[in-house]
Amino acid sequence: MKNIMVRDEVYEKLQKMKKGRESFSDVILRLIEGRKKRGIEILERYAGSLSDSELEKIVMEERRKFRVRSFDS
């Protein structure tokens, strides 16, 4: 088990998202898994109906939306 720190506003939002006796870890995992499923659903919806160049364009647009946070050592 690991400890993480989040801003107060993030804590409050996670607290509101909890269902029943769900832990914060459960909430975060649910959010992550939901995001993965949406990505898979999008790919399945377009599978076979787009040309390779159209699919590549969509993939590149989605990659640009993805933010990576860098950490100073």
UniProtKB/Swiss-Prot annotation:
Keywords linked to the UniProt accession: Toxin-antitoxin system
One Pfam family here: VAPB_antitox
Name by which UniProt lists this protein: Putative antitoxin VapB16
Lineage, uppermost ranks: Archaea, Methanobacteriati, Methanobacteriota, Archaeoglobi, Archaeoglobales
Recorded family membership: Belongs to the UPF0330 family.
Disulfide pairings: none
Its job: Possibly the antitoxin component of a type II toxin-antitoxin (TA) system. Its cognate toxin is VapC16 (Potential).
Native source species: Archaeoglobus fulgidus (strain ATCC 49558 / DSM 4304 / JCM 9628 / NBRC 100126 / VC-16)
